[in-house]
UniProtKB/Swiss-Prot annotation:
The lineage of its organism: Eukaryota, Fungi, Dikarya, Ascomycota, Pezizomycotina. Belongs to the polysaccharide lyase 3 family. Binds 1 Ca(2+) ion per subunit. It comes from Aspergillus terreus (strain NIH 2624 / FGSC A1156). This is Probable pectate lyase G. Keywords: Calcium, Carbohydrate metabolism, Cell wall biogenesis/degradation, Glycoprotein, Lyase, Polysaccharide degradation, Secreted, Signal.
Length: 247
């Protein structure tokens, strides 16, 4: 029995090693670094171009302990754009959007609690290019209303790429996913069918070693945790199986 357990462990570690060797997270080369003593605010309608520097807060990640606005690296106000930046490992909360925002070519070296939290507004939130790795749970957390567009994002070693808040009450949300590369994750998308959420996943998406492409839940108003209802294509999870493996 011990020998059999050791064999299974060896096979699992060998498979993981082979996957890691084959798929390497394409984090861009940093052009320098800056450490903020407080969140950097991108004003409404303004653009912050990070010049591909690495930005952090000089603190240790606290894992899945819920942080707050004061713990973020960037806060993006309504209509703001954050582009060409790397979020370093020395942070608790990555980026908050307090209204419709554009996140363009932003990379997370290692996600702490969440990478990107959409906190306020009900417009369009666009995530274009960029990527994230090492998320124990969620990469993109959608708390408010509106529509999220995720295009050209790369996500490795993650819990969920996108999750519409399951404990924020009856708010309808939409998400569309295209040209995404997903490797080694639990769930690409999670939405609340009882709130009328929909997820549209384009055939340009590839996924390797991802357990579920899309799952639906019954969301709550915060008094209890949401329960998973189903996985796979449905009236709420709109896509065609099979999703291609990443080349």
């Amino acid at each position: 029995m011990v020998q059999k357990s050791l064999l299974f462990s060896l096979l699992a570690s060998t498979a993981l090693g082979a996957l890691t060797k084959r798929y390497s997270f394409p984090l861009p080369e940093s052009q320098g670094s800056e450490t903020f003593s407080e969140p950097y605010e991108v004003a409404a309608g303004e653009t912050f171009d990070g010049g591909m520097k690495t930005y952090g807060r000089g603190v240790e990640c606290t894992g899945q302990v819920e942080g707050g606005e004061d713990d973020t690296v960037f806060i993006v106000q309504e209509g703001g754009t954050l582009k060409n930046a790397i979020i370093g490992t020395d942070q608790i909360e990555g980026v908050y959007c307090l209204g419709s925002c554009t996140i363009e070519n932003v990379w997370w070296e290692k996600v702490c609690e969440d990478a990107l939290s959409l906190k306020e507004g009900d417009g369009i939130y666009t995530i274009s290019g960029g990527g994230a790795q090492g998320a124990e749970d969620k990469v993109i957390q959608h708390n408010t209303g509106g529509e999220v567009i995720i295009d050209g994002f790369e996500v490795y070693d993650f819990g969920k790429l996108y999750r519409s808040c399951g404990t924020c009450g009856d708010i309808q949300r939409k998400v569309s996913v295209s040209n995404v590369v997903a490797v080694s994750g639990s769930q690409l998308v999670g939405i609340n069918e009882n709130f009328g959420d929909t997820a549209t996943i384009d055939s340009s998406v590839c996924a390797t070693d991802v357990n579920d492409i899309c799952a639906t839940y019954n969301g709550t108003d915060g008094d209890e945790e949401p329960e998973e209802v189903s996985t796979g294509p449905s009236d709420y999870c709109i896509y065609t199986e099979p999703i291609a493996e990443c080349a």
